[in-house]
Amino acid sequence: MFLKRWFIRALHRLQKGPGYGYSELFVWYCNNTNTHGPKRLIIEGPKKKTLWSLFTVTFACLVFWQWGLLIQTYLSWGVSVSLSVGFRGMDFPAVTVCNVNPFKYSKVKPLLKELDELVDILLEQFYSYSTNGTLPVVFPDMRSSYLTGDPPPWYQIPLVMIDETDADNPTVTNVLGTDALSPTNNSTTNSSTEARRYKVAFHLCNTNGTDCFYKNFSSSLEAVKEWYTLQYIDIISKLPLSQKVEMGYSGKDFILTCLFGGEACNYDNFTQFYHSSYGNCYVFNWGLDGNVLIVSNPGVGFGLQLALDVNQEEYIPFLTTRAGARFLLHTQNTFPFVETMGTYALVGTVTSVGILVDEVQRMGQPYGTCTTDGLDVPIDNLYSQYNLSYTMQSCLWSCFQIQMVNSCGCAYYLYPLPEGATYCNNQNNSDWAYCYYLLQDSKDHKNECLQTCIQTCNELQFRISTSMADWPSESSEDWIFHVLSYERDDSTNITMKRDGVLKLNLYFKEFNYRVITESVATNVVWLLSNLGGQFGFWMGGSVLCIIEFGEVFIDCIWIAVIRFVKWYKNRKERQVQAQYADPPPTVSELVEGYTNQGFQPDIINSCSPQAQPPDLYLPTTLEIPGTPPPKYDSLRVHPIDTEHHSDSEDL
């Protein structure tokens, strides 16, 4: 009941309003506020009032300006980065090692025989053109291979030479086309006296040939290698996985010796997987079974020591132009992107790799964009088929592969295959190279992937420092190679060469790690503190002053509402009065209007014999009766009976 009465009184106060105008409200506020300055506006003289008005308005504007900047800074959701150093036993990273040569040439040579012969012809073409400006006639056995019947697969990616000796009239020659079978029209005389300027390019077109472009290369070496790689991909993509694994390097042939923390290990301690670029690769301490090796001391003796045999004699000549191994340090249960993030190890040397660990902790929404498991990223992670964790790199390559399938109708060989898609080849996808290079150079597609893929919230980053020395030394070369040869194939003779082996040492350089942590830079406490600081500095105010101002603001609103209601009522009353232009009737006119003659008594001689009863059905000219006037005795006024009162007094 008490609560009900309180609400009723509050409602009456709200309906009644402040009870004064704006000027009275302003005077009341200046007299009662705790803010410095407003009181001077009503107690000082005219000049000081003007001066203090200027001060108050200026400082109030400064306060609001500073408040706007502070709120804008708070809503930017900024973060601060802190760096701390810790000491503990650390998980040894996963180590992936690959031979830069994917397959043994002795096993893959039958598949590449025709392609290798064609590359020999290409090199002869380039040499002849650069010296005398002519293209030699192709060998007769190769002539029939692409002039009769259907064109060979490599014809889908034409290799052309652009002669820029005459800058105003450059000539384009298809090296493998019909115009390549005879010398060009360029004279040999000019070429002998003037060096020929030409460049090699791909002439790529869509399926119907309506859109074409040239992909230029800085040298014929890069052009031939790139062209050979595309043809190699076309051949290898058709082979089953088991055959590709069988053509690669086995763990027994590749890994000669292994030590971890002073304990012996071998290729059985590595996990083998097939890499599209490097063939069979081997991962140490991948952690797929949940077991991760921990190191408690820094130094070479507590790390991983490997001796690898890359066997250069089995290198594919036109595909692999570098010799050595490629290794990558990464976290457990993540895919090793060796081709983009790996490091080379040189043959005939020992490469020592010191490892430093950085632990990065990022903040999520609204302070940043990161993901814990990648499930909130709107891209299918194609590397999840390996049961591996999400990484930024896996998202980028998955995004590119999905765009490749959507744009070109087939998948690129170096990345995992999406469900329902097939790898590109020259027979079924004649314009796949044209589509691939357009997609690769498209900034829109790159930006789309960069904007869609986000980093993980918690990540380990490995920083490495490398140093190298010759291995083995000349004095120890003989006995080391004897021992390694015997351990590998029980041979008493030396079957290894310096240009085919290398040693790799990986260890923690320092037994500490850095933690890079993002934290909130502007929280609510920071915002309120700075808002109050600015208000107090410029106007000497506090939170209570803001409440006072809010009270005055509400009163101003109610004054405006009440005035509007009064104005609206007065307007309605004026509209009602305007409908009656004549003066209002008097009381006598109203009474006369309510008098009906039909109810007045008629003077009829009922005793007269001639009197007849009225015919109720005859039409009458009398008006329709209205409402009769009141004739109640209680409403009649009688004169005062003075005599009666006097008599009663006498009694």
UniProtKB/Swiss-Prot annotation:
Organ and tissue specificity: Strongly expressed in gill, kidney and rectum and more weakly in brain, eye, liver and muscle.
GO BP: sodium ion transmembrane transport
GO cellular component, one term: sodium channel complex
Catalysed conversion reaction: Na(+)(in) = Na(+)(out)
Disulfide bonds: C98-C281, C205-C212, C258-C265, C370-C457, C395-C453, C399-C449, C408-C435, C410-C424
Biased composition annotated in UniProt, kind: Basic and acidic residues: 633-651
A GO term for molecular function: ligand-gated sodium channel activity
Localization terms from the record: Apical cell membrane; Cytoplasmic vesicle membrane
Sequence intervals crossing the membrane: 51-71, 542-562
Main location: membrane
Cytoplasmic side: 1-50, 563-651
Membrane-topology annotation of the record: Multi-pass membrane protein
Family annotation (Pfam families): ASC
Regulation acting on activity, per entry: Originally identified and characterized by its inhibition by the diuretic drug amiloride.
Binding partners and assembly: Component of the heterotrimeric epithelial sodium channel (ENaC) composed of an alpha/SCNN1A, a beta/SCNN1B and a gamma/SCNN1G subunit.
Stated role: This is one of the three pore-forming subunits of the heterotrimeric epithelial sodium channel (ENaC), a critical regulator of sodium balance and fluid homeostasis. ENaC operates in epithelial tissues, where it mediates the electrodiffusion of sodium ions from extracellular fluid through the apical membrane of cells, with water following osmotically.
Similarity annotation: Belongs to the amiloride-sensitive sodium channel (TC 1.A.6) family. SCNN1B subfamily.
Name under which the protein is recorded: Epithelial sodium channel subunit beta
Species whose genome carries this gene: Neoceratodus forsteri (Australian lungfish)
